[in-house]
Every structure is written in structure tokens, then in C-alpha cells.
Amino acid sequence: MLSPKRTRFRKQHRGRMKGISYRGNRICFGGYALQALEPAWITSRQIEAGRRAMTRYARRGGKIWVRIFPDKPVTVRPAETRMGSGKGSPEFWVFVVKPGRILYEMGGVSEIVAREAISIAASKMPIRTQFIIAG
């Protein structure tokens, strides 16, 4: 699972997912990519599941780039706990995805293989996505 080695602060505010992604919205490394169409929190488990699905389908062919990294801690309170007594402890890590963000890139394979591998990874994501081609 992906998570930061160390952070400046243990806990973060939840924040808002306003607007579109201005950074990380162009294909930089591969020839094909998976682009987000909705805002959401994507957990490190979902990122890893998508990466594994793509790797399995492509087998040894091609290269995969994961363009997102979960850097936001999400805290969870224990079940049946009364209100108060502070914020819960960090349980998992998420990445805040905005529309337009590139999630995965793929290169060194044919378009048919890339399209199928990326569609399998897209089914692991909690949001609507689209397959895009560089150029």
C-alpha cells in the first residue's frame, strides 16, 4: 500500500473538492492514460488494485506509470464512541482527485491491450473515468 514515509502533521482537515485539476492533466510518460471525470477520494488500496489489474493484464509487456500518490490521512473514530474527546486516529491514506486528473499511464503496448488493461483498472475506481490517447 502507498503511504508517505513521514508527514509534517499527523492529521488533516477534510477539505473540499472544488473545481478541476490544473496539474497532472496531460499525458507525460506513456501513450495511453486513464483520466478522472469526477471528484473523489481515492484510497491507497484502490490505487494498488488498479495498478495490479493493469500489470496482470499487460503481463511483461509495456510499462505502467501511477500518476497519483495518497498523501492525505483520513481519521476514523472507534465504533460506538461518544462525541468529543478529540479527533480519531489516522486509519488510511487517500489522494484527492479532481476532474481531468491523469491516474495511470501506459506505454510500450498496442492500443487494444492498453484499452482493455485500463478499462479493468477503471472498474476498480470509485469514479467515472475515460481512456485517452497521447497526441
Curated annotation (Swiss-Prot):
Signal sequence extent: none
Primary localization: plastid
GO CC, one annotated term: chloroplast
CDD domains per record: Ribosomal_L16_L10e
Molecular function in Gene Ontology: rRNA binding; structural constituent of ribosome
Localization per Swiss-Prot or TrEMBL: Plastid, Chloroplast
One matching Pfam family: Ribosomal_L16
Entries under InterPro entries matching the protein: Ribosomal_uL16, Ribosomal_uL16_bact-type, Ribosomal_uL16_CS, Ribosomal_uL16_dom, Ribosomal_uL16_sf
Entry keyword set: Chloroplast, Plastid, Ribonucleoprotein, Ribosomal protein
A Gene Ontology BP annotation from the UniProt entry: mitochondrial translation
Subunit record text: Part of the 50S ribosomal subunit.
Family: Belongs to the universal ribosomal protein uL16 family.
Protein name: Large ribosomal subunit protein uL16c
GN (gene name): rpl16
